């Protein structure tokens, strides 16, 4: 994989709802229409039962070689813009001031949403 491809940030979650089995991470470019709604990839991170707090580790961009406990739900859509296939695509606007975010969802074993939060990752 391309070590220069960037990676997801480490995310610290607290007060995870009881019954949460997975955390769904939907990475989005809020500015560029073609990469909204998970355009930078959707990842699932599996938790042990009744986890209250977790540090979600980073995931390398432009690869499907994911760390333990991660699953690619939807690969990034950057291939239509010349990027290498993979589960996640790091911010890549080239400094145009795009805003990037991640929708964080706690889901139970039946994929019912228990809680959600949107975290703005920054502008690049």
Give the positions of each predicted feature.
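N-terminus-centered regions that define maturation/targeting leaders and the start
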Residues: 1-124
């Amino acid at each position: 994989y391309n070590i220069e491809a960037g990676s997801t940030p480490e995310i610290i979650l607290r007060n995870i709802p009881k019954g949460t089995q997975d955390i769904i991470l939907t990475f989005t470019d809020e500015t560029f229409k073609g990469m909204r709604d998970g355009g930078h990839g959707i990842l699932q991170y599996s938790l042990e039962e009744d986890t209250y707090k977790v540090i979600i580790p980073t995931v390398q961009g432009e690869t499907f070689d994911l760390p333990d406990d991660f699953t690619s739900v939807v690969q990034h859509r950057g291939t239509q813009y010349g990027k290498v296939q993979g589960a996640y695509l790091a911010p890549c606007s080239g400094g145009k001031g795009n805003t990037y975010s991640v929708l964080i969802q706690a889901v139970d074993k039946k994929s019912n949403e228990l809680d959600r939060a949107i975290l703005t990752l920054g502008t690049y």
